[in-house]
Regions:
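Conserved alpha-helical segments that form or flank metal/cofactor-binding pockets of metalloenzymes
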Residues: 11-32
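Divalent-cation-assisted or electrostatically stabilized phosphate/pyrophosphate-binding catalytic cores
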Residues: 27-45, 80, 103-149
């Protein structure tokens, strides 16, 4: 149903409001691996916890939906269309603070979603490399390389 689809789309941030120490504790409790970057930046764990809760608390059996939740902050190489849509939508949503090149990225999202993914990751990695927000997650780097290589083949 349409209501069910809206509900599932909102699950991507269901663990976002948990305090940092609680995110770490819950990941440990549920046997979810925590990388060094995630331990240093626990806000990243909301995606992993959200995917876990989608399955365990909310009964989401669809692997594509759970993967879209898990990778909506970092992306991953070779994402499905749903994963790309959730990744891009999370970045370009209207309530987000103004970001560099956001209008261009929003336009790309509707004409070339792979280019939009690469553009988002370029901006994210530039921001992280500036030292503004801690370490860079390796999955974001791998995803950026994957999507820039797709665009260079054109």
């Amino acid at each position: 149903s349409a209501a069910s689809d809206v509900y599932k789309r909102q699950l991507h941030d269901c663990a976002k409001c948990l305090p940092a120490d609680e995110k770490i504790a819950r990941c440990k409790k549920h046997g979810l691996p925590i990388s060094q970057v995630e331990f240093a930046n626990p806000e990243l764990l909301h995606a992993k916890l959200g995917a876990y809760y989608a399955r365990e608390k909310y009964g989401v059996d669809d692997e594509d939906i759970r993967s879209a939740i898990e990778f909506h902050t970092t992306g991953r190489p070779a994402m499905s269309l749903l994963e790309k849509i959730v990744f891009v939508a999370d970045y370009i949503e209207p309530n987000r603070k103004p970001l560099p090149e956001i209008d261009e990225i929003r336009n790309e999202a509707f004409s070339d979603i792979d280019a939009s993914v690469a553009h988002i990751l370029k901006n994210t990695l530039t921001y992280l490399d500036s030292g503004s927000c801690g370490d860079t997650d390796e999955m974001s780097v791998r995803t950026y390389k994957y999507y820039t290589s797709l665009n260079s083949e054109d």
